[in-house]
């Protein structure tokens, strides 16, 4: 399995015949160089969406049309988009699991918000969510934008993820100290990858507090477009 950070909260996850783009943000993403846009999305088979804030959703519909791939996400929004936007979608809900080209993806709760702007005004984007992604003997917990929440207790116990991709930039999500607390209290990660940081001045610029807070855990500070192989 390859995990490739596309900057901010965006990822490309490759496993076998599956190439999953998670919250792909290209245009306006200050951490993803423009000359890397094509390489970031080429060969994608699915787009996973955690919620509909602009820095996660702005490129989802254009990419779905360009790449001719389905968008996978929360049932209510996917139902709306399949009709209003005439794109292929895979809608499911928290607790549910879908298999995408051999990769099992389970939807889990997050604690955030999810709205987007339409010509008619602000619209609910359904529930904000995270994902447990199981492939090649690993379970990856992709938190999406979230704060610390009690649901992490059963999520860690039930899915037993060994890799955590945690939003940890602060202000809108957990900060590095909070992510370290959540990882220690609720999970038994072998590897942690922070995200949703280093993109805006208001967000944390270093993962040092996460590294210091998780002795014995491999904390990987991702570099944009560099594959992490697990």
Swiss-Prot record:
Signal sequence region: none
Keyword Iron-sulfur: no
GO molecular function: hydrolase activity
InterPro entries, per database record: Metallo-B-lactamas, RibonucZ/Hydroxyglut_hydro, UPF0173, UPF0173_UPF0282_UlaG_hydrolase
Pfam family, one: Lactamase_B_2
Keyword annotations from UniProtKB, A to Z: Hydrolase
Family, similarity comment: Belongs to the UPF0173 family.
PANTHER family: UPF0173 METAL-DEPENDENT HYDROLASE MJ1163 (PTHR43546:SF3), UPF0173 METAL-DEPENDENT HYDROLASE MJ1163-RELATED (PTHR43546)
Name of the featured protein: UPF0173 metal-dependent hydrolase SPO2976
Organism: Ruegeria pomeroyi (strain ATCC 700808 / DSM 15171 / DSS-3)
